[in-house]
Protein backbone atom coordinates (compact mmCIF):
# COMPACT_ATOMS: atom_id res chain seq x y z
CA UNK A 1 0.00 0.00 0.00
CA UNK A 2 1.13 3.56 -0.65
CA UNK A 3 -0.48 4.92 2.52
CA UNK A 4 -1.24 3.27 5.85
CA UNK A 5 -2.95 4.77 8.89
CA UNK A 6 -1.55 3.09 12.00
CA UNK A 7 -1.92 3.64 15.69
CA UNK A 8 -3.45 2.47 18.91
CA UNK A 9 -6.25 3.30 21.28
CA UNK A 10 -7.21 1.97 24.68
CA UNK A 11 -10.03 2.69 27.10
CA UNK A 12 -8.91 0.55 30.00
CA UNK A 13 -10.07 2.43 33.10
CA UNK A 14 -12.48 -0.21 34.36
CA UNK A 15 -12.66 -1.94 37.74
CA UNK A 16 -11.78 -5.30 36.17
CA UNK A 17 -8.61 -4.01 34.50
CA UNK A 18 -7.58 -1.98 37.54
CA UNK A 19 -8.20 -4.96 39.81
CA UNK A 20 -6.14 -7.27 37.61
CA UNK A 21 -3.09 -5.00 37.54
CA UNK A 22 -3.47 -4.25 41.25
CA UNK A 23 -3.47 -7.99 41.91
CA UNK A 24 -0.18 -8.23 40.01
CA UNK A 25 1.16 -5.37 42.18
CA UNK A 26 1.95 -3.40 39.05
CA UNK A 27 0.11 -0.19 39.99
CA UNK A 28 1.43 2.69 42.05
CA UNK A 29 -0.02 2.96 45.55
CA UNK A 30 0.40 6.75 45.79
CA UNK A 31 -3.34 7.32 45.85
CA UNK A 32 -2.92 10.25 48.24
CA UNK A 33 -0.58 12.06 45.79
CA UNK A 34 -1.65 11.11 42.27
CA UNK A 35 0.34 13.91 40.64
CA UNK A 36 3.53 12.36 42.06
CA UNK A 37 2.63 8.72 41.42
CA UNK A 38 4.05 8.21 37.94
CA UNK A 39 7.82 8.48 38.35
CA UNK A 40 9.81 6.31 35.91
CA UNK A 41 13.46 5.68 36.80
CA UNK A 42 13.09 7.42 40.18
CA UNK A 43 14.29 5.58 43.28
CA UNK A 44 10.86 6.04 44.89
CA UNK A 45 8.83 4.59 42.00
CA UNK A 46 6.37 1.88 42.99
CA UNK A 47 4.38 1.03 39.87
CA UNK A 48 2.56 2.61 36.97
CA UNK A 49 -0.51 4.82 36.70
CA UNK A 50 -3.08 3.46 34.27
CA UNK A 51 -4.55 5.91 31.76
CA UNK A 52 -6.48 6.08 28.51
CA UNK A 53 -5.82 7.66 25.15
CA UNK A 54 -5.06 7.21 21.48
CA UNK A 55 -2.37 8.04 18.96
CA UNK A 56 -2.33 7.73 15.16
CA UNK A 57 0.23 8.26 12.43
CA UNK A 58 0.06 8.29 8.64
CA UNK A 59 2.78 6.20 7.00
CA UNK A 60 3.52 6.72 3.31
CA UNK A 61 5.97 5.32 0.83
CA UNK A 62 8.68 7.95 0.37
CA UNK A 63 8.18 8.23 -3.39
CA UNK A 64 4.40 8.54 -3.01
CA UNK A 65 4.77 11.27 -0.36
CA UNK A 66 7.21 13.21 -2.52
CA UNK A 67 5.00 12.91 -5.59
CA UNK A 68 2.01 14.46 -3.82
CA UNK A 69 4.08 17.13 -2.11
CA UNK A 70 3.44 15.87 1.41
CA UNK A 71 5.11 17.48 4.40
CA UNK A 72 7.20 14.64 5.84
CA UNK A 73 7.78 14.98 9.58
CA UNK A 74 10.20 12.07 9.93
CA UNK A 75 11.14 8.71 8.46
CA UNK A 76 10.34 5.37 10.06
CA UNK A 77 13.72 3.91 9.21
CA UNK A 78 13.56 0.61 11.04
CA UNK A 79 11.72 -1.66 13.45
CA UNK A 80 12.66 -4.55 15.69
CA UNK A 81 10.32 -7.12 17.23
CA UNK A 82 11.06 -9.97 19.63
CA UNK A 83 8.91 -12.22 21.79
CA UNK A 84 11.00 -13.77 24.54
CA UNK A 85 8.21 -15.40 26.60
CA UNK A 86 10.51 -15.14 29.62
CA UNK A 87 7.77 -14.46 32.15
CA UNK A 88 4.23 -13.11 32.29
CA UNK A 89 5.28 -9.94 34.09
CA UNK A 90 9.07 -9.97 34.58
CA UNK A 91 11.03 -8.50 31.65
CA UNK A 92 14.13 -10.08 30.10
CA UNK A 93 17.02 -7.84 29.17
CA UNK A 94 18.11 -10.21 26.39
CA UNK A 95 14.82 -9.92 24.51
CA UNK A 96 14.81 -6.14 24.83
CA UNK A 97 18.42 -5.87 23.70
CA UNK A 98 17.72 -8.03 20.65
CA UNK A 99 14.72 -5.87 19.72
CA UNK A 100 16.82 -2.70 19.90
CA UNK A 101 19.56 -4.33 17.86
CA UNK A 102 17.08 -5.51 15.24
CA UNK A 103 15.66 -2.00 14.87
CA UNK A 104 19.14 -0.54 14.45
CA UNK A 105 20.09 -3.11 11.80
CA UNK A 106 16.82 -2.59 9.94
CA UNK A 107 17.47 1.16 9.89
CA UNK A 108 21.10 0.79 8.88
CA UNK A 109 22.18 2.53 12.08
CA UNK A 110 24.49 1.81 14.98
CA UNK A 111 24.07 2.66 18.62
CA UNK A 112 26.41 5.62 18.14
CA UNK A 113 23.94 7.16 15.67
CA UNK A 114 21.11 7.38 18.20
CA UNK A 115 20.66 10.79 19.81
CA UNK A 116 17.49 10.14 21.80
CA UNK A 117 15.52 7.27 23.32
CA UNK A 118 11.86 7.55 24.27
CA UNK A 119 11.79 4.79 26.86
CA UNK A 120 8.90 2.44 27.62
CA UNK A 121 9.68 3.01 31.32
CA UNK A 122 6.41 2.47 33.18
CA UNK A 123 7.71 3.14 36.68
CA UNK A 124 7.80 -0.44 37.95
CA UNK A 125 10.78 -1.32 40.17
CA UNK A 126 12.05 -4.18 37.98
CA UNK A 127 10.99 -2.98 34.54
CA UNK A 128 12.84 0.34 34.54
CA UNK A 129 16.14 -1.18 35.65
CA UNK A 130 15.89 -3.92 33.03
CA UNK A 131 15.20 -1.44 30.25
CA UNK A 132 18.04 0.83 31.37
CA UNK A 133 20.43 -2.09 31.10
CA UNK A 134 19.11 -3.00 27.64
CA UNK A 135 19.57 0.57 26.40
CA UNK A 136 23.10 0.71 27.81
CA UNK A 137 24.07 -2.59 26.19
CA UNK A 138 22.49 -1.99 22.78
CA UNK A 139 22.93 1.78 22.35
CA UNK A 140 25.30 3.15 24.98
CA UNK A 141 25.25 5.88 27.60
CA UNK A 142 25.21 8.91 25.30
CA UNK A 143 21.55 9.28 24.14
CA UNK A 144 19.22 11.65 25.96
CA UNK A 145 16.48 9.50 27.49
CA UNK A 146 12.96 10.48 28.46
CA UNK A 147 9.89 8.62 29.69
CA UNK A 148 6.57 10.08 28.59
CA UNK A 149 4.54 7.88 30.93
CA UNK A 150 5.67 10.18 33.73
CA UNK A 151 3.25 12.72 32.20
CA UNK A 152 0.67 10.59 30.41
CA UNK A 153 0.48 7.51 32.59
CA UNK A 154 0.46 4.06 30.98
CA UNK A 155 -2.04 3.96 28.12
CA UNK A 156 -1.52 0.20 27.71
CA UNK A 157 -2.42 -0.67 24.10
CA UNK A 158 -2.17 2.96 23.01
CA UNK A 159 1.15 3.75 24.66
CA UNK A 160 3.36 2.63 21.77
CA UNK A 161 1.53 4.76 19.24
CA UNK A 162 1.36 7.83 21.48
CA UNK A 163 5.05 7.59 22.32
CA UNK A 164 5.93 7.16 18.64
CA UNK A 165 4.21 10.50 18.05
CA UNK A 166 6.17 12.03 20.95
CA UNK A 167 9.39 10.73 19.41
CA UNK A 168 8.62 12.20 15.99
CA UNK A 169 7.71 15.56 17.53
CA UNK A 170 11.00 15.55 19.42
CA UNK A 171 12.86 15.22 16.12
CA UNK A 172 10.70 17.89 14.48
CA UNK A 173 10.99 20.51 17.23
CA UNK A 174 14.42 19.67 18.63
CA UNK A 175 12.98 19.59 22.13
CA UNK A 176 13.06 16.55 24.41
CA UNK A 177 10.41 16.45 27.17
CA UNK A 178 11.65 15.72 30.69
CA UNK A 179 10.90 12.78 32.95
CA UNK A 180 8.41 14.21 35.44
CA UNK A 181 8.79 13.46 39.14
CA UNK A 182 12.40 12.34 38.68
CA UNK A 183 14.11 13.46 41.88
CA UNK A 184 16.90 10.87 42.12
CA UNK A 185 17.55 8.09 39.65
CA UNK A 186 17.44 4.61 41.07
CA UNK A 187 20.61 2.56 41.48
CA UNK A 188 21.39 0.64 38.31
CA UNK A 189 19.93 3.28 36.00
CA UNK A 190 23.00 4.85 34.45
CA UNK A 191 21.44 6.85 31.63
CA UNK A 192 21.42 10.47 30.50
CA UNK A 193 17.92 11.16 31.80
CA UNK A 194 16.27 14.45 30.83
CA UNK A 195 14.90 16.02 34.01
CA UNK A 196 13.95 19.38 35.47
CA UNK A 197 12.65 20.75 32.17
CA UNK A 198 12.75 20.22 28.40
CA UNK A 199 16.13 19.89 26.74
CA UNK A 200 17.05 21.46 23.43
CA UNK A 201 18.68 18.91 21.14
CA UNK A 202 19.21 18.67 17.41
CA UNK A 203 18.45 14.95 17.39
CA UNK A 204 18.64 13.25 13.99
CA UNK A 205 17.88 9.67 15.01
CA UNK A 206 15.73 8.37 17.86
CA UNK A 207 14.30 5.14 19.22
CA UNK A 208 10.88 4.52 20.72
CA UNK A 209 10.69 1.38 22.86
CA UNK A 210 7.65 -0.67 23.86
CA UNK A 211 8.21 -3.61 26.19
CA UNK A 212 4.99 -5.29 27.27
CA UNK A 213 4.02 -8.04 29.69
CA UNK A 214 4.63 -11.52 28.31
CA UNK A 215 7.88 -10.52 26.65
CA UNK A 216 6.43 -8.58 23.72
CA UNK A 217 9.19 -6.20 22.64
CA UNK A 218 8.92 -3.62 19.85
CA UNK A 219 11.40 -0.86 19.00
CA UNK A 220 10.94 1.77 16.30
CA UNK A 221 13.79 3.81 14.79
CA UNK A 222 12.93 7.27 13.46
CA UNK A 223 15.24 9.60 11.56
CA UNK A 224 15.00 13.12 10.19
Q: What do the predicted segments below correspond to?
A:
Residues 9-18, 111-127:
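Conserved beta-ketoacyl condensing-enzyme motif
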Residues 21, 58, 76, 114, ...:
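Conserved small-residue
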Residues 99-107, 138, 167, 171:
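Stable alpha-helical structural segments in soluble proteins, enriched in small hydrophobic residues
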Residues 85-96, 123-139, 155-162:
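Short glycine/threonine-rich loop-to-helix capping motif typified by GTGT followed
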Residues 32-109, 115-116:
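Condensing-enzyme catalytic core mediating Claisen C-C bond formation in acyl metabolism
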Residues 1-64, 159-224:
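Conserved beta-strand-centric core segments of catalytic alpha/beta enzyme folds
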Residues 4-9, 71-79, 112-119, 144-150, ...:
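Beta-strand segments within the central parallel beta-sheet cores of soluble alpha/beta enzyme folds
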Residues 35-43, 81-83, 140-151, 202:
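Glycine/charged-rich beta-loop-alpha catalytic/anionic-binding loops adjacent to active sites
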Amino acid sequence: ADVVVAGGTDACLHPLALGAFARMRALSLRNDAPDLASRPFDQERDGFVMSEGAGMVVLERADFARARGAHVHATLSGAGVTSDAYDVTLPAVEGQTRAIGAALRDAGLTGADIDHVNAHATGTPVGDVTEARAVREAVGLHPAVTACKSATGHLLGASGAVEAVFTVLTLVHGLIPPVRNLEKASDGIELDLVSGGPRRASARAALSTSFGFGGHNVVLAFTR
